[in-house]
Amino acid sequence: MEKVFERLMYASRWIMAPIYLGLSLILFALGIKFFQEIFHIIPNIFSIKEVDLVLITLSLIDITLVGGLLIMVMFSGYENFVSQLDVGENSEKLNWLGKMDAGSLKNKVAASIVAISSIHLLKVFMNAENIANDKIMWYLLIHITFVLSAFAMGYLDKITRK
């Protein structure tokens, strides 16, 4: 009975596989939004204000960072919790595949969230005249919370690895 239970529990990790695959659909949606922004800029490129262009650029960087975060979570999560990725000897293989454990993935995700939050905060600051001061304060507090959380997770990871 114990063996059956353990095999069943071990096999249940495959439930995560379609979830990781589903994240690729979100990645596809981000790609659509990215190019939608590009196509909105092109007709107005000569009339758009520099500040607006910078804000749009920051939005595109934000989308790119979220996409990178998704790829990292999809591949590392799949490799850590479901099965090893077999991409073949002759094909390109990302150098970090198979080398990122759950702890380092957590730190990379935290660093990515801080980077995404930084871009978002920069967008808020660039548009500060249109945003209430109390809202800016909340954006700043949330960002500081992300930074402190990432630092704490990194520090805890460092002391537990010793």
UniProtKB/Swiss-Prot annotation:
Taxonomic superkingdom: Bacteria
Membrane topology: Multi-pass membrane protein
Any Pfam family hit: UPF0114
A GO term from the CC aspect: plasma membrane
Subcellular location: Cell membrane
Keywords (A to Z) from UniProt: Cell membrane, Membrane, Transmembrane, Transmembrane helix
Protein name listed in UniProt: UPF0114 protein Sfri_3655
Protein family according to the UniProt entry: Belongs to the UPF0114 family.
RNA-binding among keywords: no
Spans traversing the lipid bilayer: 15-35, 53-73, 136-156
Annotated InterPro entries: UPF0114 (IPR005134), UPF0114_bac (IPR020761)
NCBIfam families, alphabetized: HI0507
Principal localisation: membrane
